[in-house]
Amino acid sequence: MIELIPAIDLLNGQCVRLTKGDYDQKKVYNDNPAEVAKDFEKLGFKRLHVVDLDGAKSKHIVNDAVLKAITTETNLTVDFGGGIKTGEDIEKAFAAGASMVTVGSIAVTNPDLFMEWIDKYGADKLILGADVRNGKISINGWKEDSSEDLLPFLKKYIDKGVRYVLCTEISKDGTLQGPAIELYKEVMAAYPQLHLIASGGVSCNEDIEALEAAGIPAVVFGKAFYEGKIDVEKLGVK
């Protein structure tokens, strides 16, 4: 069974979704993210993906208090990303109750620091965020594209023990146009040992079923749930 991970994106302390990472195209779904997290837990979900959009934009963690509220008020296993740029940021995230931290930009801009974190915290506490636009890794809240190609970028860290990769196809994110299944199949064919988490574009139960049929281990979804396009009962969440 594919692992199902709902997402909460935080902006100004609210639960929002963007379209293709565009801060000007935001939709607010709830003013109380901790209540949203509790609702996910009641539905039977065990995991939660939390993104600090303020942090991604300002290049340091911002919403650690909201993260703390979520981890205090639920028993969900929370992974947290957005604005993790320094040792202080990552410590704050873990102190606020994150079980895992998603790191993207630093793995591109400061690989030595990311390697240090792998050594310090262990590869099982870190998710490598690989946000892709036109085949290149994008950084800093998706505002900049790097020169890094996806597969070589992943290999560099897989060789260091990284097993968890959250891969977002930016052109799909928040569009409800279906996930980039061919991209994920390409990654899994190259690195079958990866615990790949697909993200972006999920629009319905059938998209999740298609990812499962393609052998993708896990999926993050947000807008499709908030817009009522996913039937949780049919997903078989217990």
Please provide the spans of the model-predicted regions:
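Active-site-adjacent beta->alpha loops and helix N-cap segments on the catalytic face
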Residues: 3-4, 55-71, 85-91, 105-127, ...
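Short, well-ordered coil/turn segments that N-cap beta-strands
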Residues: 1-4, 44-47, 74-78, 98-99, ...
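N-terminal beta-alpha supersecondary unit
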Residues: 15-61
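Short, acidic/polar
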Residues: 29-41, 86-91, 145-156
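Conserved, mostly hydrophobic/aromatic
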Residues: 9, 40, 48, 93, ...
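Conserved anion-binding
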Residues: 13-15, 19-24, 98-173
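Catalytic cores of alpha/beta
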Residues: 74, 78-101, 182-218
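Short secondary-structure boundary segments
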Residues: 8, 52, 105-106, 130-132, ...
